[in-house]
Amino acid sequence: MSERAHIPVLVEECLALFAQRPPQTFRDVTLGAGGHAYAFLEAYPSLTCYDGSDRDLQALAIAEKRLETFQDRVSFSHASFEDLANQPTPRLYDGVLADLGVSSMQLDTLSRGFSFQGEKEELDMRMDQTQELSASDVLNSLKEEELGRIFREYGEEPQWKSAAKAVVHFRKHKKILSIQDVKEALLGVFPHYRFHRKIHPLTLIFQALRVYVNGEDRQLKSLLTSAISWLAPQGRLVIISFCSSEDRPVKWFFKEAEASGLGKVITKKVIQPTYQEVRRNPRSRSAKLRCFEKASQ
């Protein structure tokens, strides 16, 4: 795993949110490679129970090895947000953390199919590799109208209609199985000016496919409807998002929860990475952190 995969996003800001009331119990529902977990366990000796979960078995294996030093304080489970929502909560937590979206480890492992930097690699994109549906299944089986909806709703792709049409046209002659196949099918769709921007034209298409394959909108809904009930009084829920389709529902859910008297929004203004962090870790540039504190009673 590359060194970049070891860099947790907005880690200092996360730690600072718990500085006044150091946590004793914590639930990390996107454990990943264990970057945030390592920082919390090192910074807070009071934290004797850190329950980490992830959908990705490969990530869990990396995290277990990385967190060996803290093995008596941390537990690991293979679970999605939906799984956790449907299970009894083992305890109440002083903090809950969700770092949404795809991890650097998943992007850098080209065989996982999350990155358009690959070529011959399979177009997979499954966070949980025990599930059946892959991104290539989606592109080869769904109707043009449904593909367009996915590109529009989950990727906010301006060329969603022509992209869907291009996929359907391409697959009449050849199945879309690899990352190179996607490039051949779609790169002619985008206007030239989009190739001169910082964000590659395929970024939004890949985002849309990933969100659909992994049911990320449904998973986020499960998290939001359950997470406050996992918190102890004055416990804090921290959610880091990377695109507007993730951040919008978090923002509105926190506002509604505050209006309902469940607690208060701590981040009246969203927290974003500093210039220094973005230089150190360019993938952090679109990160947005929001925090909600549960009421004391």
From Swiss-Prot:
Keyword match Cell wall biogenesis/degradation: no
Enzyme class: transferase
Main location: cytoplasm
Coiled coil: none
Residues noted as binding S-adenosyl-L-methionine in the record, renumbered to the chain: G34, G35, H36, D54, F81, D99, Q106
Localisation: Cytoplasm
Any matching Pfam family: Methyltransf_5
Molecular function GO terms recorded: rRNA (cytosine-N4-)-methyltransferase activity
EC number: 2.1.1.199
SUPFAM superfamilies: Putative methyltransferase TM0872, insert domain, S-adenosyl-L-methionine-dependent methyltransferases
Keyword Membrane: no
UniProt-listed GO biological process terms: rRNA base methylation
Catalytic activity: cytidine(1402) in 16S rRNA + S-adenosyl-L-methionine = N(4)-methylcytidine(1402) in 16S rRNA + S-adenosyl-L-homocysteine + H(+)
Alphabetical UniProt keywords: Cytoplasm, Methyltransferase, rRNA processing, S-adenosyl-L-methionine, Transferase
GO cellular component: cytoplasm
Source taxon at top rank: Bacteria
Role this protein plays: Specifically methylates the N4 position of cytidine in position 1402 (C1402) of 16S rRNA.
NCBIfam families the record matches: 16S rRNA (cytosine(1402)-N(4))-methyltransferase RsmH
Similarity section: Belongs to the methyltransferase superfamily. RsmH family.
Name recorded for this polypeptide: Ribosomal RNA small subunit methyltransferase H
Protein source organism: Chlamydia pneumoniae
